[in-house]
UniProtKB/Swiss-Prot annotation:
A Pfam cross-reference name: Epimerase
GO molecular function ontology, one term from the record: protein-containing complex binding
Modified residues (N6-succinyllysine): 175
Species of provenance: Gorilla gorilla gorilla (Western lowland gorilla)
Subunit record text: Complex I is composed of 45 different subunits. This a component of the hydrophobic protein fraction. Interacts with BLOC1S1. Interacts with SLC2A4. Interacts with CLOCK. Interacts with RAB5IF.
Name listed for the protein in its UniProt record: NADH dehydrogenase [ubiquinone] 1 alpha subcomplex subunit 9, mitochondrial
Keywords: Acetylation, Electron transport, FAD, Flavoprotein, Mitochondrion, Respiratory chain, Transit peptide, Transport
Family assignment from sequence similarity: Belongs to the complex I NDUFA9 subunit family.
InterPro entries listed in its UniProt record: ComplexI_NDUFA9_subunit, Epimerase_deHydtase, NAD(P)-bd_dom_sf
Localization, UniProt: Mitochondrion matrix
Residues recorded with modification N6-acetyllysine: 189, 370
Cofactor(s) this protein cannot do without: FAD
Example GO BP: ubiquinone biosynthetic process
Cofactor binding, per record: Binds 1 FAD per subunit.
């Protein structure tokens, strides 16, 4: 009798699962949808041990922004698939960011479509954070910002991915003097063509603990006087905090109205480059000695760093980007539209710049430093 009751329960459960699968399949239109999986059913009270219903593939997760995005996805109970090309020891810092079994690491080849298809086929969200500050003999800016995102977007669309998020740049412009920004603009277009519902994020220069923005300027103290084109009086910057960008990306994943939109992520204040670098040196308690260096001479210096066998501290393209004023894009939604209040630079700069202080000033209070002057241009 007990065996008969058990068999009836098994039959009911199997029928229920079949019915759920049939319903999930019947409501799918367009590209083929994968069968319902337990990881797609939200449950729990929130937190890393819950299930958010998000199965996200995050390309570029090992980079500066990627670790924050993975952490925010992991802490809400998402399953995160992390494609990587680096040594396994270089992804160890990501493992504690999710519950047991929720972070899956897969090796991939950026030029192999089968490899890309394998890492997106089980996801309902794909986030592309792939970027590079300088070109190499293996990957130039066109590869990184155009060809690879286009392939990922196309294969994600074919796999039935529900949400695709592509991170570009605020100053992406097909007519820009920077090859980096020109390819960013082309990348936006090809992604939009391949995945019309894609969400495009356009952040300004991002600052945070491991950035190449505040840290790059602060490290100039090693060279003595600080070279700035036109002393930085003709360039305006509006940097944004990395945690805000990460939260914005995650909120865009959860927002059903975000599909097909472009978002401009910027900080709350705009600064002349001169005042910004002066503030950076004040927080780092370093002597600020700026001098005007013509851009053609700056490019020549950058070329010397480019041909060195080490990671270039500056490149000719970075010189261009450094002296381009951040665009104002009031027609695009921003962080506020995703429920995020932008964090002022003055609140978080000390987290980044304390490491550049000498021992004498290591514990000095940030209140001793005057805030950077802001502009409205």
């Amino acid at each position: 009798m007990a065996a008969a009751a058990q068999s009836r329960v098994v039959r009911v459960l199997s029928m229920s699962r079949s019915a759920i699968t049939a319903i999930a399949t019947s409501v799918c239109h367009g590209p083929p949808c994968r069968q319902l999986h337990h990881a797609l059913i939200p449950h729990g009270k929130g937190g890393r041990s819950s299930v958010s219903g998000i199965v996200a593939t995050v390309f570029g997760a090992t980079g500066f922004l990627g670790r924050y995005v993975v952490n925010h996805l992991g802490r809400m109970g998402s399953q995160v698939i992390i494609p990587y090309r680096c040594d396994k020891y270089d992804i160890m810092h990501l493992r504690p960011m999710g519950d047991l079994g929720q972070l899956l690491f897969l090796e991939w080849d950026a030029r192999d479509k089968d490899s890309i298809r394998r890492v997106v086929q089980h996801s309902n969200v794909v986030i592309n954070l792939i970027g590079r500050d300088w070109e190499t003999k293996n990957f130039d800016f066109e590869d990184v910002f155009v060809k690879i995102p286009q392939a990922i977007a196309q294969l994600s669309k074919e796999a039935g991915v529900e949400k695709f998020i592509h991170v570009s740049h605020l100053n992406a412009n097909i007519k820009s003097s920077s090859r980096y920004l020109r390819n960013k603009a082309v990348g936006e277009k090809v992604v939009r063509d391949a995945f019309p519902e894609a969400i495009i994020i356009k952040p300004s220069d991002i600052f945070g603990r491991e950035d190449r923005f505040l840290n790059s300027f602060a490290s100039m103290h090693r060279f003595g006087p600080i070279p700035l084109g036109s002393l930085g009086w003709k360039t305006v910057k509006q940097p944004v905090y990395v945690v805000d960008v990460s939260k914005g990306i995650v909120n865009a994943v959860k927002d059903p109205d975000a599909n097909g939109k472009s978002f401009a992520f910027v900080g709350p204040s705009r600064y002349l480059l001169f005042h910004l670098v002066k503030y950076i040196f004040a927080v780092a308690h370093r002597l600020f000695l700026p001098f005007p260096l013509p851009l053609f001479a700056y490019r020549w210096v950058a070329r010397v760093f480019e041909i060195s066998p080490f990671e270039p501290w500056i490149t000719r393209d970075k010189v261009e980007r450094m002296h381009i004023t951040d665009m104002k894009l009031p027609h695009l939604p921003g962080l506020e539209d995703l429920g995020i209040q932008a964090t002022p630079l003055e609140l978080k700069a000390i987290e980044v710049l304390r490491r550049h202080r000498t021992y004498r000033w290591l514990s000095a209070e940030i209140e001793d430093v005057k805030p950077a002057k802001t502009v409205n241009i």
